Amino acid sequence: MSDFIINRVQMFLAEANKASVEVSDDLIEEFANACKDAFKKQFTEERETKFRYRMSNVGKPLCQLQMEQSGAEAEAMPYNAKMRNLFGDLIEAAAIIIMKASGVEVKDIQKKVQYKFDDKYINGTMDVKIGDKIYDIKSASPYSFENKFGENGGFDALKNDDPFGYLAQGYMYGEGAKSDFGGWIVINKSTGEWCTTEVPPEDSSKQEVINKAKENIKNYIKELEYLI
């Protein structure tokens, strides 16, 4: 599936370099609305101040989650961090429209999902479903594009060095959506290149990663009960 996605996107963009291409008014309107929502998200929406575990953070090291939960003051972000976040949202919005326009079957965009275990649950918002698999869209620096997701990286490199918990995030999106997690669709935010990092068919790490994330949740809840 990942080769199909990249091939269709590359053909579409190559054709757009040579001449105008067909993009429906509905897709253009969808992109405009996504850009508007991205700007509101980064600048005008009320920020969530209370820490909560979610699919996008539960795979991080437990000590980091505990620091965030305790309210420890984080290092001040540089002023341009907000621009980086906005660029990421806009690239993701463009990626979805480009895939749709190139003939990739994109569905269930930004769908809320929930994973339940024991008497607990964790929420998240998956990016897209393509075919029968869930994919996460990432914008990446040139270094990360090459060395984490691209030719010099790949699934094994990401599995061995995953401080942001990308694997746990993706696996839980899949579990919550009751579909397999396919991997990552990645756009180099400097050059515009695309690549995919596919989860291998015989993936032995899934349950181990999910179990570690569940243990993080249990320890997080236990610490809250202790503080209360």
What are these regions (language model features)?
Residues 127, 136, 169:
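Acidic active-site catalytic centers that drive phospho-/nucleotidyl reactions
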Residues 136-139, 145-149, 184-186, 194-197:
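A short secondary-structure junction signal
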Residues 100, 139, 175-178:
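Hydrophobic/aromatic-lined pockets within catalytic cores
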Residues 97, 168-175:
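A broadly conserved amphipathic alpha-helix scaffold signal in soluble, globular proteins
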Residues 153-167:
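A short acidic, glycine-rich active-site loop
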